Amino acid sequence: MEAAPARRPRSLSRALAGERPAGCGCPPAPSAKAEARVLVINTGGTIGMVQDAKGLAPEANKLVNSLEKMPMLHDKAYAQETKLNNSHEFPENTLVLPVSKQNKRIFYTILELSPLLDSSNMTPDDWAKIAKKLEEHYEKYDGFVILHGTDTMAYTASALSFMCENLGKTVVLTGSQVPIYELQNDGRDNLLGALLMAGQFVIPEVCLYFYNKLYRGNRVTKVDAGSFNAFSSPNLPPLANAEVDITINWETVWRANTKKKFRVHTNMNRNVGLLRIFPGITAAAVKAFLQPPIEGIVLETYGSGNAPNNREDVLEELKKAAERKVVILNCTQCLRGSVKTVYATGQTLADVGVIPGGDMTPEAALTKLSYTLSKRNLSWEEKRQMLSENLRGEMTVVPTGAKISLRDSKFIQVIAKSLSISSKEELEAVRDALIPPLACAAAKLGDIDALRAIAEMGGNLSCGDYDGRTPLHIAASEGHLPLVEYLLMSGATVYARDRYGSTPLMNAIKFRHIQVINLLRETGAHLSSQDLENTGTILCSLAATGDVDGLYAWYLAGADLEQTGYDGRNPLQVAEATGQKEVLEFLRQKH
């Protein structure tokens, strides 16, 4: 009898799909209490509108009651079991999703702004209002969702991407084309998808979620007024796709690469505008548009940044404006493509002082211009230079020199050959499986050169290993201060949690690495409500054993040293009862 052919193992990419670590696309294996808290800021928009005599309009105080009745958006049984509505732990208007595939519970609190707006009525003042709410609640939540009308959502997403400086958490704008209260609507799926993105992944960007795709907020534009697939990101693929599984394109995710804390910049310059070139445009129209108080414009040109070079009158007005220090940023009218000085008609604009805007959308260009011109500490030349730089991933920058790819690595090739795989997907699966433990091993040794080599080959230094521990977790545990600094400057997130729920800050506290704690705190790391759950008892235990170093570590991390333990006593009372004089002296100094 002929032997049955040996079954070829399923592809490695499929085999590893359920085990890929958090930094490479999947959240880490859940801890015993895997929870996330998301703040939903409701600004208005179609998603929460109702029909009245004049048409669709936002209605206040209706959304929460409606969501409570939707099983996909609120687990009523779990809420009753945990007495969610009567808990002092959660604010009013808090709902909870059913448990996710990753066995994670996402609690979300709805904060309704007043008045609720149709997005056509949005102004920079409203952008500032949203940004201030993000800043006010930043340390209380793991991620943020902003409900917004679709008409100006791309403008708000772009503006917030610049206003949110040193962002380290996920911010997702979403809305719908049809109110969520109607039988057939896109609001339920969009809200659920946005909550899953904000609650399960650390994507430190202002994003926009619509029709199963997560986009970079400053790369999108609304392309369809009547379709659920209303938005497009013409020059950048989606950051994530939500299909049977959620797939994150981590190589595309923008990272701040900074050691500075999150802050918002709300004083945007409103003396900006959009001017679209068209055949026969008059010099008088251009001159009128460029008059004071205008300080900057986005010039929407033909093709790859072209304008008529036989119109001396128009060019003269642009030149005069540039000489008056009006900043002019050149963007293409095309949906896809970039401004390039390939044609003489494009070079002519550069010659009169117009700045090439690359492949920015008009929405991104306008809000970037508004943001840059508001930086009063910068000179005119510095502002022009800033507009040419890629600040938040809003434009494509072609890297100089060839970059080594992990696919070209002999190490990866040998492993791939031994596993008989050759497809791009399988090679990526090999990379995603091997890079995290290699990077973590280098972090344990404090080997910056090894990590730099991994990064230069395209490795993601925010990847977690099989336990969800990132190189920053390891470096913080070992107290390798220069390595922690390098990882932070390479975009490593201080908010990553391993399967046990620990952050790099918690690891640094545990091993008493004071300098690392200070650096992480400077970067914006903080203790969440989850981290502080049993802190009172831990602090009392440290006080009872005379562990001043441990108490100091918690103090630097932001813990309240007056928290009580399980028996109602605080660390000071415990130290008095146990006669720990050094602890008493320390605690009295800090009170």
Where are the predicted features?
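Accessory alpha-helical/coil subdomains and C-terminal extensions
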Residues: 34-35, 41, 63-81, 91-102, ...
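Conserved ankyrin/ankyrin-like repeat signature
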Residues: 450, 482-483, 515-516, 549-550, ...
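Ankyrin-repeat boundary/"N-cap" motif
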Residues: 431-439, 464-470, 497-503, 530-541, ...
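ATP/NTP phosphate-donor binding region
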Residues: 3, 7-136
